[in-house]
C-alpha cells in the first residue's frame, strides 16, 4: 500500500483515499468515522508500536496499528 495511516507523522494531516479491510473491519472503521475523503490528523503514537490517537473532525479515536495499515491516505 502506498501511504497508510500507520506511516503518518504525529501532528500531520492527511485525507483518507481508501479503506482496504475485510468486511467486518471495514464496517467498524466506517462507524468510527474513517470514510473516504475525510481529513484526519495523527495526534500521537503509543509506545512500542502501540495504538494511534487520531482526530477525525472534532472526534478523537484510538486505533490499533494493524487497523491503521488498512487505511490508505494522501497528504
Protein language model regions, located:
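C-terminal structural segments of small proteins and small subunits
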Residues: 3, 45-75
Amino acid at each position: 500500500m502506498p501511504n497508510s495511516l500507520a506511516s503518518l507523522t504525529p501532528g500531520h494531516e492527511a485525507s483518507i483515499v481508501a479503506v482496504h479491510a475485510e468486511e467486518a473491519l471495514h464496517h467498524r472503521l466506517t462507524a468510527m468515522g474513517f470514510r473516504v475523503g475525510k481529513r484526519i490528523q495523527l495526534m500521537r503514537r503509543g509506545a512500542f508500536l502501540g495504538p494511534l490517537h487520531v482526530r477525525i473532525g472534532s472526534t478523537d479515536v484510538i486505533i490499533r496499528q494493524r487497523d491503521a495499515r488498512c487505511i490508505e491516505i494522501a497528504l
